[in-house]
Amino acid sequence: MEKNIAVIKGDGIGPEIVTESMKVLDKVAEKFGHKFNYTQLLMGGCSIDANGVPLTDETIAACKASDAVLMGSIGGDTTTSPWYKLPANLRPEAGLLGIRKALGLFANLRPCLLYPELAGACPLKTEISAKGFDMLIMRELTGGLYFGARKTEEVNGVMTATDTLTYSEDEIRRIAIKAFDVAMKRSCLLYTSPSPR
């Protein structure tokens, strides 16, 4: 098997973690006769430093042309990094949001596993943690607060902030379908968070 992998080492500890991950992939390739072709790309703060923007069209094109993307952390210390003095659309995380949209990466799957043996270390109530649990939390990544309009204005002499949470019917449908598909494969119950009214 031969695969092309776009590698975005990112910022902070990202380069160290991705470099070690590539070593693991190389061992897998060696053991099982695979070949991984890596294309090194920039995104986030390192791309701002090199290109003036957190995500370039070239990086998007290379990711789209690859079989997979291996990516490290994006961004840095918001209190000390000069990146966070930039407008929001030029900060490192704008690259992350841009690549998600460009590649259609809308579902973030976050497993949460607690073995019964570790229940005593869990901050949840004993009746919840005693038997352990295996949950998968799915989060939509390309709509809602990530891309909602924000504004600050004076209303009746008081400063007011608005941050909109908007989802299209298609965005809701695709995340619901993904959640049902994953739940069926896990042979578990599916819960959805209620919509605020």
Give the positions of each predicted feature.
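Buried hydrophobic positions in well-ordered alpha/beta secondary-structure cores of metabolic enzymes
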Residues: 11-14, 67, 138, 179
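N-terminal phosphate-binding or glycine-rich loops at protein starts, especially the Walker A/P-loop
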Residues: 2-32, 36-37
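N-terminal glycine-rich phosphate/adenylate-binding segment common to multiple enzyme folds
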Residues: 49-162
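Conserved small/polar residues in nucleotide/adenosyl-binding loops
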Residues: 191-197
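N-terminal beta-loop-helix "entrance" segment that forms/cooperates
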Residues: 35-56
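Glycine-rich phosphate/diphosphate-binding loops that line cofactor/substrate pockets in enzymes
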Residues: 1-2, 176, 180-189
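Active-site glycine-rich loop that binds ribose-phosphate moieties when present
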Residues: 157-180
